[in-house]
Swiss-Prot record:
Chain intervals with Polar residues compositional bias: 315-328, 384-399
Top-level taxonomy: Eukaryota, Fungi, Dikarya, Ascomycota, Saccharomycotina
Protein's recorded name: Ingression protein 1
InterPro entries: C2_dom (IPR000008), C2_domain_sf (IPR035892), C2_fungal_Inn1 (IPR037791), Ingression_C2_domain (IPR052981)
Predominant place of localization: other
Gene3D superfamilies: C2 domain
Domain of life: Eukaryota
Organism of provenance: Saccharomyces cerevisiae (strain ATCC 204508 / S288c) (Baker's yeast)
Compositional bias ranges of the Low complexity kind: 360-377
SUPFAM superfamilies: C2 domain (Calcium/lipid-binding domain, CaLB) (SSF49562)
Record's keyword terms, sorted: Cell cycle, Cell division, Mitosis, Phosphoprotein
Subcellular locations according to the entry: Bud neck
Residues annotated as domain C2: 1-114
Length: 409
């Protein structure tokens, strides 16, 4: 069994003995009375006697023990056969290690079957026991809390203050400055290595007080390699890229200068009367055909083409305007004063009946023909008695109205 002492927090151990089975029967003529006894260190608990329990007793016995770190985590379980007038007879016993129960979850616990033994390791049945350990949380008083806080403050005050970042043995060097000076350091280091000068770790760069540019050490001093920037050595490829960039810019500047000269000559050709042309000598005349071939232009008659385009546009617009006028119908003549007076007098005359012949007479000198009446159809003549097609009411075939009945006197 385990011999270690539990050094954890103190708590309460709950022991629940459920039942036992296959116990030997010590009474030959009757069923035996069974009792249970539990012991942890100096603490002993005994159950009530179960009368006539026999070989498969059911205990349902619960007991609690206060566990402290000084108590050995071991429990003894003993089962007895109780006799009224005599001392009880031991049926079986077992030892249970409590560390499994103490380390288990308090909500689940630890339960299993344990074997009982008699003297000489003889089998005496099994017993089912459930163990649950609930630790006690220590409660600190205010005085204890204050002591703990004071102790923590004193320990933090005794700690040394770390040095500031500025108090380093090497000066600060920016990355851009390091890129510019690293190739020079590499070249000087290779040259001095061939000469056999010694190397030592230190600060290669010294920041001047007037500016923030890094300056190499004196040529008389031994070469000093920087300890922190050794990985950035050997960047000679950056110099090659700079050379190519410079060559490209020089070529572009040359082409721009040639184009500027050609543009000036073209302006002189277009504006011969300008002040710039008067200042130049006659010997600076330009061959137009050669200039056109050099530039890649077929002709320089931009002004003539523009004039021709303007003339074509003007002719097209004028012809389009005339054709548009021909398609429109002719406008009516402008009315005169006499026509206006006649029209107003005709509007002021009163209305006449339809049977008056003067309304339909178009030969009157004062009548003004309305444009809408020229194309209107003629009205049919009114029916008269002389017309042969006219039928009187008497000769009509339609039924007549029924006469009213005679009045009674």
């Amino acid at each position: 069994m385990s011999e270690e002492v539990w050094n954890g927090n103190q708590g309460i151990l709950s022991v629940y003995v459920s039942k036992a089975r296959d116990l030997p029967n010590l009474n030959k003529l009757d069923k035996q009375n069974v009792m249970l006894r539990l012991r942890i260190a100096h603490m002993t608990r005994a159950s009530n006697t179960l009368h006539r329990a026999g070989q498969n007793p059911v205990f349902h016995y619960l007991e609690k023990f206060d566990i402290t770190p000084e108590i050995k985590p071991l429990m003894y379980v003993e089962v007895y056969c109780d006799r009224r007038k005599k001392s009880p007879l031991p049926i079986g016993r077992c030892e249970i290690d409590l560390l499994n129960a103490i380390r288990a979850d308090p909500k689940e616990g630890y339960c299993t079957w344990y074997e009982l033994k008699r003297s000489g390791d003889e089998f005496a049945g099994t017993i089912f026991i459930e163990l649950t350990f609930t630790p006690k949380v220590p409660r600190l008083n205010r005085d204890d809390l204050n002591k703990e806080m004071d102790r923590l403050d004193s320990s933090m005050a005794m700690r040394p203050i770390p040095p500031l970042p500025t108090e380093s043995e090497y000066d600060y060097v920016h990355g851009s400055t390091m890129r510019q000076i690293t190739p020079q350091c590499v070249s000087t280091s290779h040259e001095d290595k061939d000469e056999g000068q010694p190397y030592r770790n230190g600060n290669v760069f010294s920041m001047s007080s007037k500016s923030d540019t890094a300056v190499l050490a004196n040529s008389n001093d031994p070469i000093i390699l920087p300890p922190t920037f050794s990985a950035s050595m050997g960047t000679t490829s950056t110099l090659e890229t700079n050379d190519t960039a410079i060559s490209n810019t020089s070529n572009t500047k040359f082409h721009f200068a040639n184009l500027r000269k050609l543009k000036e000559k073209i302006n002189i050709f277009k504006n011969p009367d300008s002040s710039t042309n008067n200042c130049q000598n006659e010997s600076n005349k330009v061959d137009i055909e050669a200039l056109q071939k050099a530039i890649g232009v077929t002709s320089l008659s931009y002004d003539e083409d523009d004039d021709d385009d303007d003339e074509n546009d003007a002719f097209y617009s004028s012809s389009h305007r005339v054709s548009h006028n021909y398609n429109q119908p002719p406008l009516p003549p402008i009315p005169t004063r006499d026509d206006m007076s006649n029209y107003s007098s005709s509007r002021n005359t009163p209305l006449v009946r339809r049977d008056r012949p003067s309304r339909l007479d178009s030969s009157s000198p004062n009548s003004h023909p309305h444009p809408s009446g020229l194309n209107s159809p003629k009205l049919p003549p009114l029916p008269t008695t002389s017309n042969s097609n006219f039928n009187s009411r008497k000769n009509s075939m339609s039924p007549t109205r029924k006469r009213p009945p005679p009045r009674l006197s």
